[in-house]
Curated annotation (Swiss-Prot):
Its main location: membrane. The lineage of its organism: Bacteria, Bacillati, Bacillota, Bacilli, Bacillales. It holds the Pfam family ATP-synt. It comes from Oceanobacillus iheyensis (strain DSM 14371 / CIP 107618 / JCM 11309 / KCTC 3954 / HTE831). The gene is atpG. Produces ATP from ADP in the presence of a proton gradient across the membrane. The gamma chain is believed to be important in regulating ATPase activity and the flow of protons through the CF(0) complex. This is ATP synthase gamma chain.
Length: 286
């Protein structure tokens, strides 16, 4: 059995850990609230841009664009959004497990796919396992702006335009609520989720022509989808961090209770032993 000094030391150490995890929980909660606002605030812009693109793409015209057309898939790009730091529970492992399962299911050679990474955890994971990483951005801020990912988003879209990849999928944690985040794996390019009712619900006049507008808008739209997923993923990351720190704080409380009980029992046993020795000594003197 541990000594009273050891038990007391463990109790004090656990109390300090509890204070740290409690503070980290509050910080994560604050970051999550801001990240959630950012993610939800971006939705109206993304929806309006999709409406405009849908209206042009679905108009009665011969206008076409490679980003709207499926082609034979010889190589697939996977854009994964992970965190730069740990202490986020299963946030990263769920994304990386989904990536590995998708690769094992759809590919037999590393030549058939490449990975674009946002976040150090995903980058380190891929490098350690020898997975092909073509582009990466590390050290993404807690509340990113479009400028933070503009270069990577633009280069990734250009990879599709140049034929370096024939489709682009994105894998990230979709934010549902503070206690619920869902791993999402969806196709980003070619774009095939445009609302076909767009042309019927919106009346636009095009100047210049549709082809020229699509040439500018479609890359911007694809880049906005990447940024929107990043904002969504950041909200999920902070929610996962908050949940992990709350769980750690609760576990620390339980451990303190258990250690305190053990300490009190040990102290009681020590007192009883001392009393027994005193009584025995008195009896011997008599």
């Amino acid at each position: 059995m541990a000594s009273l000094r050891e038990l007391k030391g463990r109790i004090e150490s656990t109390k300090k850990t509890k204070q740290i995890t409690g503070a980290m929980q509050l910080v994560s909660a604050s970051k999550m609230s801001k990240a959630e606002q950012n993610a939800r605030g971006f939705v109206p812009y993304a929806d309006k841009l999709q409406e405009v693109v849908s209206s042009i793409a679905n108009a009665n015209t011969d206008a076409q664009h490679p980003m709207l057309m499926k082609r034979e898939v010889k190589k697939t790009g996977y854009l994964i959004i992970t965190s730069d730091r740990g202490l986020v529970g299963a946030y990263n492992s769920h994304i990386l497990k989904n990536l590995v399962n998708t690769i094992e299911k759809n590919h037999t050679s590393k030549d058939e796919y490449t990975i674009i990474v946002l976040g150090r955890k995903g980058y380190d994971y891929c490098r350690k396992r020898g997975l092909p990483v073509s582009k990466s951005v590390l050290g993404v801020p807690d509340h990113p702006t479009f400028a933070d990912v503009k270069e990577l988003a633009s280069e990734t879209v250009q990879m599709y335009a140049d034929g370096d990849i024939d489709e682009l999928n994105i894998i990230y944690n979709h934010y549902v609520s503070a206690i619920s985040q869902v791993v999402t794996n969806k196709q980003l390019l070619p774009i095939d989720n445009l609302d076909e009712s767009g042309a019927a619900t919106s009346d636009y006049e095009f100047d210049p022509n549709q082809e020229q507008i699509l040439e500018v808008l479609l890359p911007q739209y694809a880049e906005s989808l990447i940024f929107g997923a990043l904002l969504d993923g950041k909200a999920s990351e902070h929610a996962a961090s908050m949940t992990a720190m709350r769980s750690a704080t609760d576990n620390a409380s339980d451990l303190i209770d258990d250690l305190s009980l053990s300490y009190n029992r040990a102290r009681q046993a020590a007192i009883t032993q001392e009393i027994t020795e005193i009584v025995g000594g008195v009896a011997a003197l008599e």
